[in-house]
Amino acid sequence: MNADAKKAALRMIPYGIYVLTADDGKGGVAAATVNWVTQTAFAPPLVVVGVKTDSGAYGIVKSTKSFTLNMLGKAHKGLAFTFFKPAQFEGGKLSGQAVHKGTNGAPILEAALAAVECKVTSIVEQGDHHIVVGEVTEAHVPNPISGRPDNAILEMKDLGDNVFYGG
């Protein structure tokens, strides 16, 4: 296979930018910027997310069978970069960001446009990112979204011409 062609083709798949959060209930909190996310069913509402297997977030999600996806808006580029590295939970803030706990215990970013709390229904363990299937159990949209909701979301292409993930 031509490696350059593979990279170019796979980078044509559009990605939103999200922050996945999880809490182990014992003081362990993790957050990670993720972009391999999609809805896969209406009833029950299911989402899938690719989570890097050697991340702290993956360990907590696998053990607790729950997570929250925080949707970032176009103005949240800085948040995306904040959670590219391991998160710190100090003084009730997650890497300096205001949060509150959802019903599943995972942090919800106060700045997020929306968040969905999920219970894990299955994990496909293949590759360097495992596919986590989550049933949406709660949804939060703290403020009305003007226009199409999908136009409000931060996308990989919004992070600049030199920021890629995948390929």
Residues of each region from the PLM?
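Basic, polyanion-binding surface patches
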Residues: M1-G167
